[in-house]
Amino acid sequence: MKKLYGNTGGLKANQTRRLEKLYRRRVPPDHVISFELARDISGLSHEIHRQVGLLIDRSGRVSWVIVGDHQKILIPDISSYRVAPGRLRGLRCLHTHLKGEALTRDDLTDLAMLRLDIMGAISADTDGHIPQIYLSHILPGATGKEPYQLLPPLKANALNIGCLDLIRALENELAQARSLHKAAKGKERALLISVTSK
């Protein structure tokens, strides 16, 4: 069984077992997360009073299960997942927020710095109901202040967002922006030292 990452101290044996079983779960690739999986991690999160996060690869496999504290998760070293110019990491992060808040500044910083496909916060109440899921993705060619775009909150019954198509479109835009930048860089340049007239 794969290991849990993060703040696992003090968990009961059955809580640890249920968290470890999350590695067996699959998400339809076009869904950001399945309703059942979102409901289950929300319930576990409220039971242990800690945020729970999942890093899900593009085929829908849970690659990392992360246990945080009441306010945040710490994403472990994911350098084994490739990242190349014009490409995203190949992982999306979905995690719970215990107080129902939207994505935090830390979440958005992780999204941008780690080049994640998508960052999501599952806003769940204590009964396990999921009123909304907040999502964001990197904004290719962003020239403004923020390098990401916040999407409208999703309802739990609308989780098929065409995830793979969205990611492919983002990577195409990133590659185009990179090739334009490369073309501009490759132009011949000259430095004028002096101009004199007779």
Predicted stretch roles:
Residues 1-85, 153-183, 187-197:
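Glycine-rich short-loop/terminal segments
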Residues 7, 100-118, 144-156:
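A broadly tuned preference for mixed-charge, low-complexity surface segments
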Residues 49-53, 89-91, 116-118:
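Short, surface-exposed beta-edge/turn micro-motifs
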Residues 53-55, 62-65, 111, 119-121, ...:
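Generic structural hydrophobic/aromatic packing signal, biased to beta-strands
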Residues 56-60, 98, 121-128:
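Short, flexible beta-strand-to-coil junctions
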Residues 65-115, 124:
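Short HxH-centered metal-ligating active-site micro-motif
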Residues 73, 116-119, 132-136, 193, ...:
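Generic preference for hydrophobic/aromatic residues in regular secondary structure cores
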Residues 118-166:
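Long, charge-dense
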